[in-house]
């Protein structure tokens, strides 16, 4: 089997990194469009006087924050030298579970399990921010 030289491997890594960067840039632009669409949807839900629309408004706000967090994650990726900080994924997970509790709160056991998952993510976040796991 042909072995690749170090310069070839670096070229492959650079090409793949550029493909990843282009993909994330495209995803970021798509998320900005969805964020704008969600802003219009929230404005519509805000001025509808029905009680059901208030429920939609809260759900829409949480979805809005999810888009916002994903965009912030992509921005942080480019600003931190092509690295995804773990805590941003934890923030997104917490927000997604809160949205799930708001949307699907049919059984108390499900809400309890979702709350336990949030507690586990908060503990993970605390551990990530502690001095033992902090990356310099």
From Swiss-Prot:
Membrane topology label: Multi-pass membrane protein
Name listed for the protein in its UniProt record: Protein PsiE
Pfam families: PsiE (PF06146)
Domain of life: Bacteria
Transmembrane segments: 15-35, 55-75, 82-102, 108-128
Keywords: Cell inner membrane, Cell membrane, Membrane, Transmembrane, Transmembrane helix
GO cellular component: plasma membrane
Predominant place of localization: membrane
Localization (cell): Cell inner membrane
One BP annotation, GO: cellular response to phosphate starvation
Recorded family membership: Belongs to the PsiE family.
